[in-house]
Amino acid sequence: MDYDFKAKLAAERERVEDLFEYEGCKVGRGTYGHVYKARRKDGKDEKEYALKQIEGTGISMSACREIALLRELKHPNVIALQKVFLSHSDRKVWLLFDYAEHDLWHIIKFHRASKANKKPMQLPRSMVKSLLYQILDGIHYLHANWVLHRDLKPANILVMGEGPERGRVKIADMGFARLFNSPLKPLADLDPVVVTFWYRAPELLLGARHYTKAIDIWAIGCIFAELLTSEPIFHCRQEDIKTSNPFHHDQLDRIFSVMGFPADKDWEDIRKMPEYPTLQKDFRRTTYANSSLIKYMEKHKVKPDSKVFLLLQKLLTMDPTKRITSEQALQDPYFQEDPLPTLDVFAGCQIPYPKREFLNEDEPEEKGDKNQPQQQNPHQQPAAPAQQTAAPPQAPPPQQSSAQTNGTAGGATAGGGGAGAGLQHSQDPGLNQVPPNKKPRIGPSGANSGGPVMPSDYQHSSSRLNYQSSVQGSSQSQSTLGYSSSQQSTQYHSSHQTHRY
């Protein structure tokens, strides 16, 4: 071995501590890493970055999978991995992301706190529409490229703060993401428990063997309902959960209490679910005879004949084969009536949400959100805390929470052809359709709020990712700022949550 050459390479290798200023700027902490708010020391740009240090030495298989995916995925609504640093001296791994100041978990918490303080301030409906549109746009891109996210929840949906991408949604935490083209084995054989419980589709709870893109759509429906009501639609107590068993009685009970028990005609294949015998044994259809999504949403002043409710109903369809797709949802009439969705979800208004607080290096890990079990994700990305939102009057400041970090999840590495080819961005037909005589403010082609549509901004790809993934069984974990996964407390009105990147 040429030790002189090796020493020369080590001297020339870029080191995180030489390039970025991040001391005292920790914004997240978790089981699998720390997240720092960072700036370049050389002043080449004034951008803020999220710098995630993965705990331990070396790089895990799950980290390899997330890094491989993130290096390939390029879309305005998917968090951008800027660079990976490998420290050969201490074998640390650092991931550099764009910094997002907010996430939906903190935004929703802000509005929930206003209700608790007797000064209710709902999320503006125009903001809800813009958030949902951009989430669907990002997921449509992932699905078009044969990627399932599999862990969508408010903490994994970041929103950019002040800057060039102000108010832009970023889907984060790809630690559980999976390529689903020609899997070698049924996905359920590899990691049977996927997606945080409150956002888990009923087919997963019933042990579906070959689940599909529909699991992400159900989770988006849950997020949509939470944006409309400021409460998790399917929250339930989640104690003593056996994560190796997909069936969870309390979670199914909560879903049926809101939606009603599915009729045979509404979900014909429910009898084929592996856990259907358990369902028959533990549940009685008559218990939920008076339950329906219509009644639940009417309590929150959402009319059953409104376009917002009709889209929610399509997203939360029990039968996954009848559930709407992301492409269909993007063309739903809900997005074609005023106010049209905007690229800046804050619509140019002042952002009332507080910025993320810095954590002390010796500050103990936050105790909140321990009661919401989820799959372990040994590697994840930091999400941004909630900060400022749209124009509504300033609500009383909620309890401030600090971001936590977690690792990445699951296990698959990039193999085969590697990530070099990149994604081909071809415009999907039909997604630029808007109502007659209406000028779109945002679309799959994206544009500045109120400005002309620029097709290059929001292009979708139907090409597959140019590499294969070998999958290991995924273990459960917490996550980092929207750049990873985190847990929510059953006391959802007062708990803190970690963020993801």
Curated annotation (Swiss-Prot):
UniProt-annotated location(s): Cytoplasm; Cytoplasm, Perinuclear region; Nucleus
Nucleotide-binding is among the record's keywords: yes
GO biological process: cellular response to lipopolysaccharide; positive regulation of apoptotic process
A single Gene Ontology CC term: perinuclear region of cytoplasm
Annotated Low complexity bias: 371-392, 467-495
Residues spanning the signal sequence: none
Protein's recorded name: Cyclin-dependent kinase 19
Source organism per UniProt: Mus musculus
Gene this protein is translated from: Cdk19
